[in-house]
Amino acid sequence: MEGFLLNEQTWLQHLKEKRLAYGLSQNRLAVATGITRQYLSDIETGKVKPSEDLQQSLWEALERFNPDAPLEMLFDYVRIRFPTTDVQQVVENILQLKLSYFLHEDYGFYSYSEHYALGDIFVLCSHELDKGVLVELKGRGCRQFESYLLAQQRSWYEFFMDVLVAGGVMKRLDLAINDKTGILNIPVLTEKCQQEECISVFRSFKSYRSGELVRKEEKECMGNTLYIGSLQSEVYFCIYEKDYEQYKKNDIPIEDAEVKNRFEIRLKNERAYYAVRDLLVYDNPEHTAFKIINRYIRFVDKDDSKPRSDWKLNEEWAWFIGNNRERLKLTTKPEPY
């Protein structure tokens, strides 16, 4: 932890300065750490010396209130079908891009006969009205489309409103929650699934561990992924170690990765539509994302003296879903094509 590298006086000064910079009262930080306000006051004035464990707890609690937000949400997969065969109308009126900028190919996917591509933005078309025009944006496609939205001075909300007004049918929507502080311990969550400490309407989960048989600082470099729910259903969750993915794809050292873990809410068809509608009605990503998560799962701590339904909510999970942290924000990360 950052504070452990500093001498005691500097550590205390740094703690207080950071708390004030984050706009936090002593009481709010104390409650989040599980101590009294008076005890925190005594720590800051040097009257008592906190243990190393308490120092670590204070830093972790403090970072949860980081104005830069320990959690952020992105759109990471968007697939929409339009009930028309007029591809130009979809591209120029809905995407608000020039069809002439797209590369045309006389083959398609998902039984479509042809497609247009601009970087990772795909528009599939068919002469059959029941297929219509399909717009597909995977992860990179979403980031590239955000560059165009920025130039158009439009937001995702305005785009989705245009989609629904035009009769667009949501086929898939992935909401990605980036965990920048490593609060989601995926091996622990996997173990909780195995120990029946995941209370869920889902009936299945799958976990994978992949990696290289190399050692970095005496540790195997591995990545963990946890799927909760059936991959064939209209809603399921995928939780994985994003830092390991970035190491594998881009050779970014794991310790330097901006995002530690990612929690993906994967929605299809009607579930995707209701999520978009909820976002447009409430303009509150926190409300939309965690309403879905809380509807389907919660992680608890086993207590053999109580019925399973009365087991206490796991503390780290409670923080993830909203206890004592700043509100989740919808962010964009525009990337040029």
Functional labels for PLM-detected ranges:
Residues 1-10, 17, 21, 64-335:
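Structured, helix-rich domain cores that form ligand/interaction pockets
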Residues 10-11, 35:
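Alpha-helix N-cap/N′ positions at the starts of helices
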Residues 19, 30, 59:
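The alpha-helix within a helix-turn-helix
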Residues 23-42:
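Short alpha-helical DNA-recognition segment
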Residues 45:
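Short, conserved catalytic or interaction motifs in soluble domains
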Residues 52-68:
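DNA major-groove recognition helix of helix-turn-helix/homeodomain DNA-binding modules
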